[in-house]
From Swiss-Prot:
Belongs to the AB hydrolase superfamily. Gene3D superfamilies: alpha/beta hydrolase. Residues 36-319 form the AB hydrolase-1 domain. The lineage of its organism: Eukaryota, Fungi, Dikarya, Ascomycota, Pezizomycotina. GO terms for molecular function: hydrolase activity. This is AB hydrolase superfamily protein FGSG_00044.
């Protein structure tokens, strides 16, 4: 084994990936952690949520890398990657690009996936591309993850959605202060999440296309019946839930709508939390070796507020598969 992507303790660069399009896709990839000493040694891959970048996961990667090799990448048109070559940005197309990225750098399974929010839909489309998914993906951690029915059943009414428009979600949810990033890391998150990058004109369009195709991508995934088939069994998986209603409550409070209809808001949040909990628990069906963890101090971004909880759960999975 003489592949720097499997041996270097730290490496990051823009990788040119052949995606069978008019031009290659430039994808930013980073890796931290001890060298891979055998081909069967599991490595971790982090898949971010919709329109999000690897900057959110710097603390988790830093905590894990002393003992586990961890790869992070920015999807096309986001963060430090090049502009997106292929549109629309469906989960299926992004899973294909992920597959080609790791083929290009010569990093093969077994993988342990750490996936957040809509990233779970992309990762599960990646599973669908594998001829032997349970042999290739030996463990998964789903953090505040979407599933097939999320976009159908978790709905914010139009007049409540309108009340949230124009708010800075990082500030309004308290996440701007309640996190474990350094000052420089927070600045980097704000920079790349806002689209103020070198390729400014394209960054928002890729993000918007991801958001616009979330519901159709979830429907396409449902047709694969992965939950019913328990496609990762008996591999260990964990579903880790935060509390997105904590974020929503803070947003509503900042917008002033809590004062206008507190009873309606509380009823909505109670229903939202109940449905969200049930939807996330259904992901456990992917494997008979699955467990549910409730984060106690987090909203949607558990990686920002409780990275040590994620780290501990990944280490537990690693012990089970090694």
């Amino acid at each position: 084994m003489n592949n720097p992507w499997e041996l270097d303790h730290f490496r990051e660069e823009l990788v040119s990936v052949n995606i069978d399009a008019a031009q290659p896709q430039q994808l930013f990839l980073s890796v931290r952690g001890p060298p891979r000493t055998t081909p069967k040694q599991p490595v971790a891959i982090i898949e971010c949520g919709a329109a999000a970048t690897t900057r959110w996961w710097t603390v988790v990667q830093r905590l894990l890398c002393p003992t586990l090799r961890v790869y992070c990448y920015d999807r096309a048109g986001l963060g430090r990657s090049g502009h997106a070559v292929v549109f629309p940005r469906t989960a299926s197309s992004m899973a294909f690009e992920l597959e080609r990225l790791f083929e290009t750098v010569g990093v093969e399974p077994p993988f342990i996936f750490i996936t957040h929010s809509y990233g779970a839909i992309i990762t599960r489309e990646f599973l669908a591309r594998l001829p032997r998914p349970k042999q290739s993906v030996v463990g998964m951690l789903f953090v505040e993850s979407n599933q097939e029915k999320t976009h159908q059943e978790l709905i914010v009414s139009s007049h409540l959605s309108t009340s949230l428009s124009g708010l800075n979600s990082l500030v309004s949810t308290g996440l701007y202060e309640d996190h474990q990033y350094s000052e420089a890391e927070v600045e980097a998150i704000l920079k790349y999440e806002s689209g103020t990058t070198t390729n400014r004109s394209d960054k928002p369009s890729a993000a918007i296309s991801e958001l616009e195709n979330m519901e159709s991508s979830a429907r396409a995934l449902a047709d694969r019946e992965q939950l019913q088939k328990h496609i990762l069994s008996p591999n260990p998986i964990t579903v880790m839930r935060g509390d997105i209603t904590r974020d929503l409550r803070r947003l509503f409070k900042t917008s002033g709508v809590m004062h206008q209809g507190a009873e309606e808001i509380e009823s909505f949040l109670e229903h939202f939390a109940r449905v969200d909990r049930q939807l996330q628990r259904e992901i456990l069906q992917l494997s008979h070796s699955a467990r549910f963890v409730q984060a106690k101090k987090s909203g949607h971004h558990v990686e920002a507020t409780e990275p040590e909880l994620i780290t501990a759960e990944v280490r537990r999975i690693v012990k089970l598969v090694r």
